[in-house]
Regions:
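Acidic helix/loop or adjacent segment enriched in Glu/Asp that either coordinates divalent metal
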Residues: 1-27
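C-terminal functional segments of enzyme domains
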Residues: 18-114
Length: 114
């Protein structure tokens, strides 16, 4: 398993279940960057996955930058309730998360190609 395949399994597969945020994965490898970028909606149902990302980030001393981008007219009531519950401002904006996979620490044996 290569380093990127490991990242795919521990991060991107989680993203496939997550339909609440726009997630931008950045890397020096621009082809990889494009391949691993996903966008989602309906954040209200996915607080657990956001917490999971926070845990991965902390374990890897990685900063997940969260900002609000792009006004959306499609906010469902559940989304508004989630923002209210979590005391976030700008409920009309979806968050954007940026993950720099080049900064994630990967076990040496996983970095090596099979």
């Amino acid at each position: 398993m290569t380093r990127y395949e490991y990242l795919l399994s521990c991060l991107v597969l989680r993203l496939s279940e997550m339909n609440g945020v726009s997630v931008r994965i950045i890397s020096k490898d621009m082809y990889l960057c494009r391949a691993l970028s996903f966008s989602y909606t309906n954040i209200g149902k996915n607080a657990e996955l956001l917490n999971h990302f926070a845990k991965i980030a902390k374990e890897n001393e990685l900063t997940i930058k969260t900002c609000f981008v792009g006004k959306s007219q499609r906010l469902a009531n559940s989304d508004k309730e989630w923002y209210k519950k979590n005391e976030l401002e700008n409920e009309d904006f979806f968050p954007d998360m940026t993950i720099d996979i080049d900064k994630i620490k990967i076990p040496k044996e996983i970095c090596e190609k099979p």
